[in-house]
Amino acid sequence: VLNKEVIEYLGRIDWRFANDKPNMFQRPFTDVIAGTQAKDFGMYHTSLEDMHGTKGDPYLNTFGKWVFHLTAEKSKHAMVAPRRMYWNFYTPNAGPDWHCDEDTFGHCVSILYNLHTNDGGTEFETGEKVHSKEGQALVFPSHLIHRGFAPTEFYHRFNLNMIVHLKNYKNPNDK
């Protein structure tokens, strides 16, 4: 019931088109959407990002912290706090690209929480594919190369992607 409430809420917020490539490699948006075979990378909404001071949406952040605490209790990782919360939205037209969430090797993990069951999911560079199952939280090192894959039978896929500090995290901006 709570996941459905969050999806209803996500239907009323502002979204941005995602681009999984670093700025220097991004194509102009007009190129991304041009032609009959064009695919976007999906959409996202940021509700928390500590590196840019984004505190965002209290409702979404409260839900995200609930997911964080439940996941941290069951995880073998010594999780401290969420660093970033991205909410992803994919349609069948999305073609997300390979990326890593954070390249701080061993200092952060990603939590990918599925808000509903659908035929989209997450694919890792190793070839492993995990389909979206409601209530499932995937935990993996944030430096692993992965991508989302869009649903084909369902028209939408919603999930929460968090980057989480581990106890051994060292902020690269601290001297």
Predicted regions span which residues?
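Catalytic core of non-heme Fe(II) oxygenases with the double-stranded beta-helix
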Residues: D50-K175
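Non-heme Fe(II)/2-oxoglutarate
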Residues: V1-A78
